[in-house]
């Protein structure tokens, strides 16, 4: 029996020495057992290293073990191997159950016990207690010794209670894997296992008390225990700031243990001879290893070749640069992928990018990490399915479930169902009611839309039944409080009903066929992992009954503890790992990614349940635990040292100056240290590209990335910039390769592309719009705003996805419909508007609103029934509007003669027919909200009123440009229809917009109710264009004195019209009529020609693109010379009249 230490600095050959010694024992035909003991995560690599030294035959004579494997072997020999272990998921479930029972008695943990993640943190702490042999009795003893006012006392008491109950619960049926080493240490001495063995312990920086116990037993049994340590020396004073401090502490403990057991300590094997084995070919890396944390230090003055720094504009560019350099090393220096490693302090932030970019560059890589199953589609399916019942069939839960891809419903059906559900606001009991869905995704459905939706409803109800059936079958079995066994059995049946096991097998096969072995490996483990969680749930929760919400929480805790370990799919791969798991042998080149402040080294973890102060209290009481945050910070320096000294030939350290969101990042202090050590260190960057040929050539590191870089370069050439000839040569190469020829042709077409919409043929126009073509005046206004938007919306019939919500247009449409119903009721009952009573108006409006809301199923407005305030506001606004209409009519001699006057096949009037030069005819349809009339000796004056819920002003310049021609066109149609009657001709009285609104009146608090009403009336004054006839205007507002409160007119004291009057003479109305007719004809000519140009307008600070839904379709971009706005300018009315007159003369 003896103990021997093998030590040396990083790269000195400690592992190789151990392997060579094992080889020599095998060569000398030693009969005693040979054991190599390494950390759990490095066993696979250690076996590979052993094979490389010994060959496949030698590996059979040597055991590569970890501490947990030694425990397993011990139980196998001494008994206890069949004792049921509890998984970490089961431990967390037990802790959740304990916390749930004890939460009423907590004071310290009363607020944190229910927080997500607390159970996992508590489980980690208990694991730490066990690794350091701390029992509940130890904690209780310390808590009793503390003063009553000590804040740690109560925390320790609560932890003791939790820990003690946990231990008792575990002892009933299980064994905690965290106890294995303690139990194994007790049994190891009584069995012959490893008697006379020679053991090499390699790769550790320190040990837990449990591991010390195992080592102590091995010392007593083995003929020799060899322990290798990475350190400069073993003696000397301990200093917390020494990067080898934890190793020297471990050495002292082991020596003390050996002496206590009478085991001799042999002279140490020192491997610090210069140059160190690993760095024999690189003086630079040797200098780095020697002086990284040395004070004082020597500088390296020559230009570095093996060490370089690289700063990148962002993380993606950093990973790309790394991939290009790896390709360069393999191509120019003959390195193998397995000789290269990538290490980062932020693996979570880099791993997806590394996978994607390395794949593009054809670099095989293995990312050394364990995969959480929480985000696996199978787990998301289970949790979202449970959420459906917990959240009462919320939209989010249902479609999280459906979009896992495991339900057996195709994506097209899911999309169709989702569109319907969003449009109709389906939720809650709507999913489970026995009646089929009959809601129509339309604001105010009519008979025609109901008929058209028949096919949609049949399809949607079929999909709905397919979705609901298995879910309701599961819910029927799990309604109310059930045992875990009932829940898990029902859940298993549910998964089998969906055919999940078969789907998982199919996915594994597809991944294997496509060469994606990592995903195949992951999927092959996930089903078993889920089944294990079910088993633990049943075992832990026993006969306790609970509801579905608690069951979901238990599963969530269980899945959160499940991680899948992956193994490399091939031998020749780049190893990618975190700073903590960066150990690897025979690495020639190392890339450090993300060498940023706070990442390299990683920021110290939060203190957790026990703060540094709490740990200090326990330490003073003789209880040893894991290191505090201060010690962890110093340990971080050792991690940096170990990482930077991993490679023997090449080291490249890179960092980004900005993250994904553009926030500034600082380089790590390590970077500044390297700049001090190496005064002439090679440093490059892609922040400001030099454009040199060498730099451009680096971009040709792989076909796919080279093609992308070539596209970027050729784009610059197309923009008139100079590029290197290499890119034209690259294009010629790609163009003759079969794999890339098609892409080059597409590229050529792309560079010739102009964002222009080509005219549509007459045949297609006829097919889209019919023969004769039918449109509306409002649509022609849309065509004026942008021909392409008109074509997409009305020609192709594109629509925005309807969302079940109350938007301003919905409110406006609804209020418009209420006023229409009210107006028809007044006319039907033959009631004069002048006789209406305000209370009666409010009462009838309220009845109409309630009646419409009752009928409106599946529209956004229907939801307002649940919001009393909104319903009341609708009633108030519409009641005010009808009362204001009545007040306008009372003040006027004009009488309403028609409501909702339609132009078209089923309207009161025939469609407005526009005959084109080609002989083609276009029928324009439309609807007038209200027509008022006044009979005089000269004829009947008509006034058209249009109700608007938004702010709509009348601008003559907008009429001139074609943006506001609707009311003038309607007036013209009525005017023309009445011109034939010579005895009573129809004459234009005006066109007006009536605003439906609930304005806020700003004034002092002393305003009377009458003053408030006047202010509201003035604010809601109609806007538009009137006939410039004082007599007629007085008929429109009999109370007018100065500025009218109801129409856009002012009468001066001398009886003339004021300058603020919006009016036109009879001649001007005739001119306007002719101009609009000509404008309509021109617009229709352009439509029938197939002009669908992307030509939006810009007027002052607004454009027709501002609220356009089709911008992603047209991709209008002002940086492209062919994409320009049609510039419109507001002009004075006199100038507009003059321009119209000029048009007429032409």
Curated annotation (Swiss-Prot):
Family annotation (SUPFAM superfamilies): P-loop containing nucleoside triphosphate hydrolases (SSF52540), Restriction endonuclease-like (SSF52980)
EC number: 3.1.-.-
Family, as annotated: Belongs to the helicase family. AddB/RexB type 1 subfamily.
Coiled-coil spans in chain: none
GO terms (BP aspect): double-strand break repair via homologous recombination
EC class name: hydrolase
Names of required cofactors: Mg(2+); [4Fe-4S] cluster
InterPro entries referenced in this protein's UniProt entry, alphabetically: ADDB_N (IPR049035), DNA_helicase_suAddB (IPR014140), DNA_helicase_UvrD-like_C (IPR014017), P-loop_NTPase (IPR027417), PDDEXK-like_dom_sf (IPR011604), PDDEXK_AddAB-type (IPR038726), Restrct_endonuc-II-like (IPR011335)
Binding site for [4Fe-4S] cluster: 786, 1105, 1108, 1114
HAMAP family in the cross-refs: AddB_type1
Domain of life: Bacteria
Keywords annotated in UniProt: 4Fe-4S, ATP-binding, DNA damage, DNA repair, DNA-binding, Exonuclease, Helicase, Hydrolase, Iron, Iron-sulfur, Metal-binding, Nuclease, Nucleotide-binding
Domain (UvrD-like helicase ATP-binding): residue spans on this chain: 1-280
UniProt-recorded name of the protein: ATP-dependent helicase/deoxyribonuclease subunit B
Gene symbol of the encoding locus: addB
Domain UvrD-like helicase C-terminal: start-end pairs: 276-584
Subunit and partners: Heterodimer of AddA and AddB.
Species this protein is from: Acetivibrio thermocellus (strain ATCC 27405 / DSM 1237 / JCM 9322 / NBRC 103400 / NCIMB 10682 / NRRL B-4536 / VPI 7372) (Clostridium thermocellum)
Cofactor details (free text): Binds 1 [4Fe-4S] cluster.
Positions annotated to bind ATP: 8-15
Any further remark recorded for this protein: Despite having conserved helicase domains, this subunit does not have helicase activity.
Physiological role: The heterodimer acts as both an ATP-dependent DNA helicase and an ATP-dependent, dual-direction single-stranded exonuclease. Recognizes the chi site generating a DNA molecule suitable for the initiation of homologous recombination. The AddB subunit has 5' -> 3' nuclease activity but not helicase activity.
An example molecular function term from Gene Ontology annotations: 5'-3' exonuclease activity
């Amino acid at each position: 029996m003896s103990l021997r230490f093998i030590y040396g600095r990083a790269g000195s050959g400690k592992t190789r020495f151990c392997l060579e010694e094992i080889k020599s024992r095998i060569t000398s035909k030693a009969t005693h057992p040979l054991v190599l003991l390494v950390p759990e995560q490095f066993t696979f690599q250690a076996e590979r290293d052993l094979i490389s030294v010994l060959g496949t035959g030698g590996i059979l004579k040597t055991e590569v073990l970890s501490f947990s494997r030694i425990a397993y072997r011990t139980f196998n020999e001494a008994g206890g191997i069949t004792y049921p272990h509890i998984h970490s998921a089961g431990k967390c479930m037990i802790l959740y159950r304990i916390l749930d029972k004890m939460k009423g008695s907590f004071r310290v943990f009363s607020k944190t016990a229910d927080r997500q993640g607390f159970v996992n943190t508590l489980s980690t702490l208990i694991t730490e207690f066990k690794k350091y042999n701390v029992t509940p009795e130890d904690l209780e003893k310390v808590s009793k010794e503390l003063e009553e006012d000590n804040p740690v006392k109560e925390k320790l008491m609560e932890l003791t209670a939790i820990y003690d109950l946990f231990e008792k619960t575990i002892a009933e049926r299980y064994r905690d894997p965290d106890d294995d080493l303690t139990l194994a240490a007790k049994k190891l001495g009584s069995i012959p296992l490893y008697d006379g063995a020679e053991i090499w312990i390699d790769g550790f920086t320190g040990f837990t008390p449990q591991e010390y116990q195992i080592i102590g037993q091995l010392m007593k049994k083995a003929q020799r225990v060899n322990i290798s340590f990475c350190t400069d020396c073993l003696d000397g004073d301990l200093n917390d700031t020494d990067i080898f401090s934890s190793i020297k502490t471990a050495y002292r403990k082991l020596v003390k243990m050996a002496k206590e057991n009478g085991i001799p300590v042999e002279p140490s094997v020192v491997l610090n001879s210069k140059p160190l084995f690993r760095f024999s070919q690189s003086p630079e890396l040797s200098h780095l290893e020697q002086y990284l944390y040395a004070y004082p230090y020597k500088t390296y003055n020559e230009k570095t070749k093996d060490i370089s720094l690289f700063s990148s504009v962002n993380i993606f560019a950093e990973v790309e640069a790394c991939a290009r350099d790896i390709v360069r090393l393999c191509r120019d220096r003959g390195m193998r992928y397995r000789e290269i490693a990538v290490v980062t302090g932020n693996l979570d932030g880099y791993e997806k990018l590394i996978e994607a970019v390395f794949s593009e560059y054809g670099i095989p890589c293995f990312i050394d990490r364990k995969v959480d199953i929480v985000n696996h589609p199978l787990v998301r399916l289970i949790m979202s399915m449970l959420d459906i019942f917990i959240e009462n069939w919320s939209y989010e839960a249902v479609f999280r479930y459906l979009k896992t891809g495991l339900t057996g419903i195709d994506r097209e059906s899911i999309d169709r169902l989702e569109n319907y559900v969003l449009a109709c606001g389906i939720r809650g009991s709507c999913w489970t009611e026995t009646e089929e869905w009959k809601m129509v995704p339309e604001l105010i459905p009519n008979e025609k839309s109901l008929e058209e939706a028949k096919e949609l409803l049949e399809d949607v109800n079929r999909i709905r039944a397919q979705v609901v059936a298995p879910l309701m079958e599961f819910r029927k079995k799990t309604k109310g409080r059930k045992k875990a066994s009932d829940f898990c059995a029902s859940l298993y049946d549910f998964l089998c009903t969906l055919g999940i096991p078969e789907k998982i097998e199919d996915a594994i096969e597809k991944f294997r066929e496509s060469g994606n072995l990592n995903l195949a490996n992951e999927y092959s483990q996930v089903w078993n992992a889920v089944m294990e969680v079910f088993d633990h749930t049943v075992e832990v929760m026993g006969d306790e009954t609970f509801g579905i919400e608690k069951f979901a929480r238990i599963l969530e805790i269980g899945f959160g503890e499940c991680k899948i370990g992956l193994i490399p799919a091939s031998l020749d791969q780049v190893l990618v790992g975190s700073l903590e798991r960066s150990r690897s042998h025979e690495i020639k080149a190392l890339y450090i990614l993300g060498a940023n402040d706070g990442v390299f080294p990683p920021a110290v973890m939060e203190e957790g349940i026990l703060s540094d102060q709490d740990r200090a209290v326990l330490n003073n009481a003789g209880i040893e635990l894991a290191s505090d945050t201060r010690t962890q910070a110093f340990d971080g320096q050792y991690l940096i040292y170990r990482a930077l000294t991993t490679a023997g030939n090449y080291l490249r350290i890179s960092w980004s100056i900005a993250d994904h969101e553009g926030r500034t990042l600082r380089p790590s202090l390590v970077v500044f240290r390297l700049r001090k050590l190496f005064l002439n260190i090679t440093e490059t960057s892609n922040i400001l590209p030099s454009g040199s040929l060498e730099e451009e050539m680096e971009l040709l590191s792989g076909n796919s990335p080279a093609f992308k870089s070539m596209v970027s370069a050729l784009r610059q050439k197309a923009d008139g910039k100079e590029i290197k000839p290499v890119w034209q040569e690259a294009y010629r190469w790609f163009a003759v390769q079969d794999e890339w020829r098609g892409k080059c042709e597409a590229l050529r077409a792309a560079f010739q592309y102009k964002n222009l919409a080509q005219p549509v043929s007459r045949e297609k126009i006829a097919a889209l719009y019919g023969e004769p073509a039918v449109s509306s005046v409002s649509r022609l206004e849309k065509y004026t705003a942008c021909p392409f938007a008109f074509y997409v919306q009305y020609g192709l019939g594109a629509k925005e996805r309807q969302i079940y919500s109350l938007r301003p247009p919905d409110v406006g449409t609804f209020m418009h419909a209420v006023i229409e119903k009210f107006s028809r009721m007044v006319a039907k009952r033959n009631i004069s508007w002048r006789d209406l009573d305000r209370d009666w108006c409010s009462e009838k409006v309220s009845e109409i609103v309630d009646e419409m809301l009752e009928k409106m199923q599946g529209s956004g407005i229907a939801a307002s029934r649940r919001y009393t305030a909104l319903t009341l506001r609708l009633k108030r606004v519409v009641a005010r509007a009808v009362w204001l209409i009545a007040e306008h009519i009372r003040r006027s001699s004009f009488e309403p003669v028609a409501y909702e006057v339609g132009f078209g096949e089923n309207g009161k009037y025939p469609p407005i027919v526009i005959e084109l030069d080609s002989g083609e005819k276009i029928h324009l349809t439309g609807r007038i909200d209200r027509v008022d009339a006044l009979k005089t000796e000269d004829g009947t004056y008509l006034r058209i009123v249009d109700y608007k819920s938004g702010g709509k002003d009348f601008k003559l310049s907008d009429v001139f440009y074609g943006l506001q021609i609707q009311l003038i066109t309607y007036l013209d149609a009525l005017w023309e229809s009445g011109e034939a009657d010579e005895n009573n001709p129809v004459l234009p009285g005006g066109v007006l917009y009536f605003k439906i609104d609930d304005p806020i009146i700003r004034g002092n608090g002393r305003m009377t109710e009458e003053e408030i009403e006047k202010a509201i009336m003035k604010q809601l004054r109609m806007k538009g264009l009137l006939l410039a006839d004082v007599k007629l205007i007085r008929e429109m507002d009999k109370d007018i004195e100065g500025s009218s409160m109801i129409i856009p007119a002012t009468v001066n004291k001398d009886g003339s019209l004021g300058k603020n009057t919006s009016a036109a003479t009879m001649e001007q109305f005739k001119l306007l009529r002719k101009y609009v007719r000509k404008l309509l004809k021109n617009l229709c000519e352009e439509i029938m020609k197939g002009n669908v140009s992307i030509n939006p307008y810009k007027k002052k600070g607004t454009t027709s693109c501002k609220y356009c839904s089709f911008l992603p379709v047209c991709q209008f971009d002002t940086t492209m010379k062919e994409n320009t706005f049609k510039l419109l300018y507001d002009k004075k009315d006199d100038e507009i009249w003059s321009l119209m007159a000029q048009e007429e003369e032409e």
